[in-house]
Amino acid sequence: MADTHPAVSIVVNTYNRGAWLDDALRGLAGLDYPMFEVIVVNGPSTDTSAAVIARWGKSIKALRCDHANLSVSRNIGIAAAAGEIIAFIDDDAVPHPQWLRRLTAAYRDPAVGAVGGFTVDNTGTHWQVRKVVCDRYGNAHPVTDLFDERPLNRPGSAFFPSLLGTNASFRAQALRGIGGFDHTYAYLLDETDVCLRLVDAGWQVHYEPHALVWHQFAPSHIRSGECVARTLYPSAVSKGYFITRHGSPGNLAGAGEALESYRRELLDVNAQFAASGTIDARHRHALDQDLLHGLRDGQRLAMAAGHKTGGDLAQVAQRPPRRFQPFAVASGRRIALISRGWPPDNDNGIARWTQLVAQGLCARGHKVHILTEAIDGARETISFEQGLWIHRLCPDEASARTGALVERYGLPWRQAAWADRVWQEAHFLKSFGLDCVSFPIWDLEGLPLLDDPDFVTVVSLHTTYALAQPFKPEWTERPLLAHRQFAPMIAAETAVLARAPHCLANSRAIIAAIADRHGIDLAPRAMVVEHGTPDPWIRRAAAAEARRVARHDHAPLRVLFVGRFEQRKGFDIAVQVAQAVIDMPNVELAFLGGELDGAARALINRLGASAILLHPRIHFAGVVQRDCLDDAYVGADVALMPSRFESFGLVAIEAMAAGLPVLTLDAGALPDVVRDDHGGRIFAQGPDVVQQIAAELVWLNVDREELALRADQARAAWAARYSTEAMAQGIEAFVAHVLATHAGKG
C-alpha cells in the first residue's frame, strides 16, 4: 500500500441505540487520522436514532437497513464505502484517538487482509477481548498477548485468528473479494465467518494490541445492559449454521459434538440464571426454546446453502459507492481537568465549575478528559459520556508512591494518595496526545504534574486553605489536626503558588486575596476568566413566566439562600434575616444547600431564632439535585448570599441567570459580580447588616416595579458576561496562550 495513511471508511451499524449513537460519533470526531469517512447504517429503529443521524447531516453517509440483521447492515455499509480500508466499530463504542493509525500500519504488508485491535469492556479498565483464536466450530480460544497468530494464517487451518466486530478492519479488496458478510448471521459469528473465509482465501488476519476501543455494552433487542439474553434465537441460528457449514465437512462427528456441547452449555447457563433469580421461569423457558429452534434452523439453512462459498454483498451492492466523504474531526486541544468531585454525586463549587468548563470546551470542539474520584465503594471506570471522557479513579493511601509524595511535598496522606492516582492516570493519557492539564489549588489535586516536564500544567485559583482558615474555627479548636492536616496544606499551597507558571483566576479579587494571605503576587502569571453558568430558563420558560406574573400580582416575595450552613457562607446572617422575615407577612425564605443537622440547629438556637424552624414561611429543603436547585432559582424572586468570602460567587450568577436580584456582602469577588447595575445590592459587613438586608426585602416586597426592573438587570448582566459560552471562549484563549508560551520556551 503506497500511502502510509490509506483512506478509511468507518462503518457504524445501529439499531435502536439513539442514546449511545451520538457519543459514538463524537468519539470518532476525536480520532487523529488524516483521511476517513463515517458511514452510519440505521436498522429499523423506532427510537431517536434517525434524529441523531439527521443532526450530523452531510458529515456522514447515512443509510438504511430495513432488517434487524447485522450482516445485512454491514454489507450495506461495505457497499457505500469508498476507502481502501473498511473499519467497523459498534454504536456503543469509542476508539482511542490513535485507533486508525495503529490499524492501518499493518496494511503496508500486501498480504494482510484484516487487522483488529484490543477491546476494553464497559468498566473502561478491564479487557473484553484481546487476541482470540477460533476453531471451525465457532469456539473461541483466548490466547496470551504474546501469542503469534501469523502461522495460523493458512487455508484450511483448524484454528485461525478471529476479530471482534466492534474493533475490526478489512482491506476493501479482500472483503469484497470474499463477498462480504453472509446474511444468515443476523447476530453472532458474522465477523468470525469473514475471518475464516479470508484465511481460506489466502489473506492474513493480524492483531494490533495498541488499537484500542472502549465498548460500553449498551442494551439491545438481543441482550440487556447486564448482558442477559432477551432472546437466543439469532445467536443459536448463527452457531448452528457455522458449525454445520465449516465444521461438518471435515469432521461430521465433531460437528455433532460441538452442537450438543453448545446446547448443553447454554441450557446450563439459563438454569443458573433462573436459580439465581436473574430471569424467571417463563424467561428461561423462552430462552431454552429459542436455543433449540435456532440450532435446528441454523443447521437447516446450512444444508440448504449447499456449496456456497462467499458472502451476500452482491445482494445489496447494486452500484459503485459514492465518492469518499471526509469526516470532520474535532480540531481542538486535548485537555484534562482534575476535580475530585463530579456532579451529580458532588455538586460543590469546584465540581460544578469543572463540569461547566468541560461542557463548554467540548461544545467548542475540544477533547476533554475528567479525572475524578469514584464514589465510595465503586470500582474504577473509564467511560465516554456526552462527549467527555470520564475517568473515575480510586486512590491508594497504602501505596509506596503515596508515601513518597507525603515526604516530598509534605501533603497529608489523603491528598497525597489522590494526587498520586491523578499523576498515574495523566501518564496513561499521554498516549492520547494530551495538550494541557488543569488542577484546582484547593487540595492540590494534581501537584506532582506541576513538576513533571512531560505535562503542560495550569492551576485554577479558588479559595485556598489559607483563605478559608479565618472562617473555620473548628480548625484551630483541634490543634493536632491543624498541625497534621491544615498547616501542611497551607505550606504546600504557598509553595505551589510561588512556582506555578500558569494560573487561571476567576476574578481579580482572588489574585488580591492570595497576595494578601500568601504574600505572592500572581498577576504576572494569571489570567482572569470569569465563571459562567447555563440558562435555567431553557427548560423552564413557562415557570419563569408564571413567576413573573405572580411577582407582578404581589404574590408572596420568595427569598432564596443557597449554600452550605457555615460561617463563610453567612448562614448565621441568613438565619437572622429569616427571623426578621417572620414579621413580614408577605415574604418567604427558603434554605437550600445544607443539612439542618445538630450543629445547624444549635447555631439557630444560639441566635435566638428557633421560631424559624417551625414557621410556615421559612423552609429548609436540604441538599438538592441540580434540577431541583434550578427549579428553586426560577421559582424565587430574590437571592440572599451573605458570604464573608467568595473567590468568585457561582451562586450569584446562577441566581442572576434566573433573573434574581442578589443581596450580598462586600466580600471577595462579590462586588465585581453583584453590582447595582446588575440588579444587586452590596452591604457592608457590620452590626446592622441584618437590619439593612431586612429593610431591602421590605422595599422589594412593596415596590414590585423596582423588583421587576432589577430582575431584568440581573438577567441581562448574566447574558452579557456570565454565560457558559463566554467562559469557555475565555478559557480556550487562556489555554492557547499557555501552550504558545510553552512552545516559545521549548
Protein language model regions, located:
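A conserved acidic beta->alpha catalytic loop
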Residues: 27, 42-51, 93, 535, ...
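Aromatic "clamp/platform" in nucleotide-sugar-dependent glycosyltransferases that forms part
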Residues: 66, 644
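Conserved donor NDP-sugar-binding/catalytic core segment of glycosyltransferases
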Residues: 98-133
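N-proximal low-complexity "stem/linker" segments adjacent to membrane-targeting elements
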Residues: 1-27, 327-329
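Acceptor-binding helix/loop patch of EC 2.4 sugar-transfer enzymes
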Residues: 400-409, 453-491, 536
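Non-catalytic, C-terminal membrane-associated alpha-helical segments of glycosyltransferases
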Residues: 251-331
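Glycosyltransferase donor-sugar binding loop
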Residues: 533, 588-606, 622
